[in-house]
Amino acid sequence: MKKLKIGITCYPTVGGSGVIATELGKMLAERGHEIHFITSSVPFRLNKIYPNVFFHEVEVNNYSVFQYPPYDIALASKMADVIKEEQLDILHVHYAIPHAVCAVLARDMSGQDFGIVTTLHGTDISVLGEDSTLAQAIKYGIDRSDAVTAVSEALKQQTYDLIDTKAPIDTIYNFVDENVFKPVDLGNLKEQFGVKEDEKVIIHISNFRKIKNLPDIVASFFKIREKMPAKLLLVGDGPEKHRIMDQVKASAYKGDVLFLGKQENITELFAISDLKLLLSEKESFGLVLLEAMACGVPGIGTAIGGIPEVIEHGVNGYIVELGDTQAVADYAVQLLQDEDKLASFRQAALYSVSENFHEHKIIKQYEDLYERVVANKNDSKTMAQRD
C-alpha cells in the first residue's frame, strides 16, 4: 500500500490505550509510514529512535482566568498546526473524548480534509458513556469520525447500547510485540524473590483502581494458599493499595504476598509466573492478559467485557463469574497441581496469541482501514471537482 503520513494522539502515560497507540505507531513506522505523535509528553513506550517518527508536544498553559488548564483547546490547535505543516493523510485518535472531538475541531480549524480514525478503548464508553452530560460529546466524536474501531466485540456492543449512534464500528483487537513478550527462562529470579521450588507463582498487574477488584484477587489467593504452596506477586500502584495491604496484613499468609510496585520489565516477572489473575469489574479487553499469554502464562478472568474474547475457557485459562473467588481458587488449584495440564495451557496461550492477536495481523487490519479511509476521501474529492 501507499506509505502514509499518520498522526497519532493518545494519553502518553502508562495504560492500555497509550501502550497500544505507541506500539501501533512504532510498528507502522517499521513498515515505512511516517508517524507523528501529537501528545502532551513523549509516550512512555516510545523508547527507540526512528527516522520517520516525530513527536509534537501539546503545551498547556495555566491561565488565571480559567478554572482548569485548557488541554482540549491546546490539543485541537496543535493538531491543526501539525496537519497543515505535515499534510497528514490520517489522524488516528485513541478515545472518543476528548481526542476525537478535538480532531474534528482541528479539521475545521485547519481547513484540511484528512481522515479521522477513532479507536474506542473502554473508559470513554463504559464510564463516560454512562454520564449523560458527556454522551452527546461522545456521539459527536464518533459520528464525525471517518472510521471507528473498538478493541473488542463486547465494547462495540456496549457502545451501541449506551450511545445513540449508527456509525459502523470495526472490531480490531489489541496486540503485543512478540519480540518483547515471549517465554524466557529466568529461574534464578525466583530465588531472588524467595520463591521455593514447590511454590507456584500467581501474578496480578494493574493500576490498583477499584474497578480492578483487588480484594477478590487477594481473597482468591488465600483460598489457593490453603490448598497448596504459592506466592502472589502484586505489581502496580494506585488508590486501592493501602486497603489491600491491610487485607493482606490480617492474613496468616501475609508472607506469601509480595507488593512489587510499578515495574518496567514485566516480561521478567511473567517468566517466573505460572498463572495470571484478572478479576475486573469492567474490562474492555484485558491487554495484560494478552501480554501474559504471549509469555506462556495462562489466566483466570471474569466474564466481563472483552475478557472472554481473550481467554478460551478450559483451553488457555478459565472464565469465572464476578465475585466467585471459590471458583477462581478451584480452577487455579486444579491447574497448578497438574503439570501436564499446565504445560498444555501454556502452549495454548502461546498459540492463541500467535493465531488471533499476532502483531502483523492486527497492523495489517489497521493499514487496510487507513487505505479505505484515504480512498473514500479521494473519491469524495474527485466527485466534488466534477460538480
Across the structure, where does each feature detected by a protein language model lie?
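N-terminal strand-loop element at the rim of the active site
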Residues: 8-15, 26-71, 169
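Aromatic "clamp/platform" in nucleotide-sugar-dependent glycosyltransferases that forms part
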Residues: 262, 281
